[in-house]
């Protein structure tokens, strides 16, 4: 993981912690993890980097939000409201690019109890530098899907048949990746159509697959934004928001022509992709993890007396204690400062 590599490179120590089942499964291979909130308290970290919406306020550490993903547009109003909701737990928000930085900085000026640093998103560090891919007579298409049934192409029988037919024709090669929460019976249907030109990949490590493919076919999956950072076109099937940086279709019959259009890499489309990604995530140096850690050190070491105390948030704090099974009156509402 890019952030872990950066932390170790600096000679610092890192421990992982998750209290929810999905997080625990993701960390099951980790030897450097804390298994209980009591262990976290004893560990006494200087910095907590979180992708979750809340964080235990009773741990005295600098609390930093690094985000789980880009702002998506599956359900625009809901996503936007959730992405920019300030819950009063964090001292620092490490934003990904101008499109989110501007909003968080406006909120910071208004609320005055957190800082904002535009760092880029550490998860995509391995994507850079962008490697130029040689074009082949049989281009490779990455198929990616979200797990919400009404938004997902993975459940669509006609889409499955079309991809199967196109792969068997030899015109395209396909690499299929489905969201891990998609039911096993749906995944099995995709596994069953595998052939020399179509492979299903059971992985959540998408960046190597991004690099192996020429274009993407997707629905509303959040992988779209990450893929576009390569300046490679994306065809979307029944995406619910119109975007000029996507090739968007509604009908299965249009899949082949849309893929061919995307493979032309039309100038107007690449221009729109570039404009979008410069707002989303302009950093292409693979150094976002370093910027995150620099921002943490900066806030740890500078005078933060100008910052207000974080809000009481009594109901949210109670819910955290109930979830973790620990009840304490401790609550640290100002940025942590290590003893020098």
What are these regions, as identified by a protein language model?
Residues 257, 263-340:
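C-terminal amphipathic helix plus adjacent low-complexity
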Residues 1-128:
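Active-site and donor-binding regions of nucleotide-sugar-utilizing enzymes
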Residues 3-8, 116-190, 284, 290:
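Conserved catalytic-core segment of nucleotide-activated headgroup transferases in glycan assembly
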Residues 13-19, 45-51, 93, 174-182, ...:
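Short, hydrophobic beta-strand segments that form beta-sheet elements in well-ordered domains
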Residues 27-38, 60-69, 190-201, 232, ...:
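Active-site regions of enzymes building and remodeling cell-envelope glycoconjugates
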Residues 34-41, 182-229:
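Donor nucleotide-activated moiety binding/catalytic core segment of transferases
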Residues 53-67, 203-246:
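A donor-sugar binding/catalytic signature common to diverse glycosyltransferases
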Residues 87, 113, 191, 222-284:
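Catalytic binding pocket for nucleotide-activated donors in carbohydrate/polymer assembly enzymes
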């Amino acid at each position: 993981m890019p952030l872990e590599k950066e932390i170790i490179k600096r000679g610092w120590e890192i421990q992982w912690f998750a209290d929810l089942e999905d997080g625990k499964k993701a960390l099951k291979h980790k030897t450097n993890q804390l298994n209980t909130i009591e262990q976290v308290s004893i560990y006494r970290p200087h910095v907590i980097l979180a992708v979750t919406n809340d964080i235990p306020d009773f741990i005295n550490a600098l609390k930093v939000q690094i985000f789980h993903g880009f702002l998506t547009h599956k359900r625009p109003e809901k996503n936007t409201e959730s992405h920019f909701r300030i819950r009063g737990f964090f001292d620092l928000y490490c934003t990904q690019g101008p499109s989110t930085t501007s909003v968080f900085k406006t909120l910071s000026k208004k609320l005055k109890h957190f800082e904002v640093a535009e760092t880029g998103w550490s998860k995509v560090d391995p994507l850079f530098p962008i490697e130029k891919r040689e074009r082949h007579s049989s281009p490779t298409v990455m198929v990616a899907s979200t797990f919400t049934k009404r938004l997902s192409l993975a459940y669509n029988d006609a889409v499955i048949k079309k991809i199967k037919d196109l792969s068997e024709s030899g015109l395209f090669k396909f690499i299929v990746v489905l969201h891990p929460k998609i039911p096993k019976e749906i995944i099995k249907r995709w596994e069953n159509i595998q052939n020399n030109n179509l492979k299903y990949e059971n992985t959540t490590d998408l960046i190597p697959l991004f690099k192996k493919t020429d274009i993407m076919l997707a629905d509303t999956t959040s992988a779209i934004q990450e893929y576009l950072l390569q300046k490679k076109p994306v065809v979307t099937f029944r995406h619910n928001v119109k975007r000029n940086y996507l090739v968007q279709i509604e009908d299965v019959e249009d899949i082949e022509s849309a893929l061919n259009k995307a493979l032309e890499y039309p100038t107007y489309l690449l221009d729109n992709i570039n404009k979008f990604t410069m707002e989303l995530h302009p950093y292409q140096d693979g150094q976002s993890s370093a910027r995150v850690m620099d921002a943490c050190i900066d806030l740890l070491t500078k005078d933060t007396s100008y910052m207000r105390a974080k809000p009481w948030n009594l109901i949210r704090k109670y819910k955290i204690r109930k979830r973790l099974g620990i009840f304490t009156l401790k609550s640290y509402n100002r940025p942590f400062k290590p003893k020098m």
